[in-house]
Swiss-Prot record:
HAMAP family: dUTPase_bact (MF_00116). The keyword Nuclease does not apply. It comes from Polynucleobacter necessarius subsp. necessarius (strain STIR1). The keyword Kinase does not apply. The lineage of its organism: Bacteria, Pseudomonadati, Pseudomonadota, Betaproteobacteria, Burkholderiales. Pathway: Pyrimidine metabolism; dUMP biosynthesis; dUMP from dCTP (dUTP route): step 2/2. It is an enzyme of class 3 (hydrolase). This is Deoxyuridine 5'-triphosphate nucleotidohydrolase. Belongs to the dUTPase family. SUPFAM superfamilies: dUTPase-like. NCBIfam families: dut, PRK00601.1.
Length: 149
């Protein structure tokens, strides 16, 4: 198993470190490290601290902050930036851009599970400028070109 360096920035998080919900879970649950409940109005976006910093270190990996499916489906709470990309050399606090895309207010409680952190392999590439691409069966077919739009 790959290891991930984590720094506790708020002592309350020492007993609330991210965990996998099940043995098959891909994401570690991130919690809202806040002093009191936050009310998020419809259409509002707030930046929520996690009280943690991570250091991926290995440039072959990156961490991604993703929404929790239940919060999105049942309460319309998603990420304001849709996906949070944490580069391997970033060492600052993990913050969760939290957007209420729904029509009712949402009350975020202290230490509530808010998002999930997934670590995945990535590959940096070297750009190669060409005049034409080698032909493929799809070509430049875009949205809906391989089925129903």
């Amino acid at each position: 198993m790959q290891s991930l360096q984590v720094k506790i920035l708020d002592e309350r998080m020492r007993d609330q470190l991210p965990t996998y919900g099940t043995p098959g879970s891909a994401g570690l649950d991130l919690r809202a490290c806040i002093d009191e409940a936050i009310t998020i109005a419809p259409g509002q976006t707030v930046l929520v601290p996690t009280g943690l910093a991570i250091y991926v270190e290995d440039p072959r990996y990156a961490a991604f902050i993703l929404p929790r499916s239940g919060l999105g489906h049942k309460h319309s709470i998603v990420l304001g930036n849709l996906v949070g990309l944490i580069d391997s050399d970033y060492q600052g606090q993990l913050m969760v851009s939290t957007w209420n895309r729904g029509s009712t207010t949402f009350k975020l409680e202290p230490m509530e599970r808010l998002a999930q952190l997934v670590v995945m392999p990535v590959q940096q590439v070297e750009l190669k400028v060409v005049e034409e691409f080698t032909e493929s069966s799809r070509g430049a077919g875009g949205f809906g070109s391989t089925g129903r739009a």
